[in-house]
Amino acid sequence: MTKLIIEWQNQFGGWYRFQEQHHEPSAYRTGKQRAKRTGKRHRLVDTDGRVLDIVEP
């Protein structure tokens, strides 16, 4: 089972870790809800650093 890392992007383009989850649908849902709530872009990254998805607010 792989870990998914949810990261958010600040106004200067830097990416910062928010949290880790194991279940991909739940990680996507969390990223989507938080992107909508904060108005900031979020992305899902695996442990090897590969970007799996980018969520726009």
Predicted regions mapped to residue ranges:
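A short, charged, amphipathic alpha-helix used as a generic interaction element across diverse proteins
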Residues: 21-46
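Surface-exposed loop/edge segments in extracytoplasmic proteins
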Residues: 13-19, 50-54
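Solvent-exposed, well-ordered amphipathic alpha-helical segments
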Residues: 8-11, 28, 32, 36-37, ...
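Short aromatic-glycine-(Arg/Gly/Cys) micro-motifs in beta-strand/loop hairpins
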Residues: 1-17
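Short N-terminal "domain-start" leader segments
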Residues: 1-5, 33, 43-45, 51-57
